């Protein structure tokens, strides 16, 4: 009795080869084109709103400069009030602050969790994709889209706020906007792309850990909120050693870290003087053209008090941006690498 065997031919060898990256990219595009379109539509709508508001802001600022600098002309006060009031659209950037965490929760968290929850990932692995190649093919294109889109939005936000950062504004009494303000710092420069990328990486890792979409979204929101709070409250102020000064005239664009008072070289109190102390020594209004804080500091200095301030000058903005962007990029790479490792080790 003869047993017939079949030799594997070239066609069978071809079926054992890994799927080319180009084909995997095509599959990823078909699976996530709706997500990519949603990202583009969401960021595009924000960009249009910024552009329209920015045009009005820049026109109002140009009119204010023409009427108030270097020679003050009729209508200057009204134009100053008009320009100052226009900042309500994006007061401290709060309107755009949720952008990174929304991307992490609704783009990053479902990208792996949805297939793990439904079980469709097994089909991809049996078609020659492989676990780590399947994971990278899903994460990398979306990560690039997220970073590019939010980076462009950050550039547009910087353009929108450019008139508010001008040093000449203090001449008009226009309230200054610090580039370190929460919500503004996070969404401008390098930080705009790296915060969104970190949120996306957090979401992807949450998806592989909990393996269900809704719990992954909740975990992403919680983890991102904790990271953002810790960064703003404890880390960012100490990227570089704060400067120390006893001069009360600090630019409004600087970031005030802490303030305290001494009297006769001994600590007196923190923060703003008490009402009773002000009434005792400085119950007169400050001289014309002088701010209340500056006038109070000078008045109390005549009674032996000195105001000490630690602060970060606005000139350090880009140094802080590169420091924060660097560690966020490293964190994102670590989270994505951990996600790939977990897919290879844990997913079944």
Residue ranges and their predicted role:
Residues 3, 17, 53-84, 168-177, ...:
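Terminal transmembrane helical anchor/hairpin motif
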Residues 111-141, 343:
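Helix-loop-helix units of permease transmembrane domains in multi-pass membrane transporters
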Residues 15-31, 82-86, 130, 134, ...:
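Cytosolic juxtamembrane amphipathic/interface segments immediately preceding
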Residues 2-44:
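Aromatic- and glycine-rich beta-strand/loop motifs that create alpha-glucan
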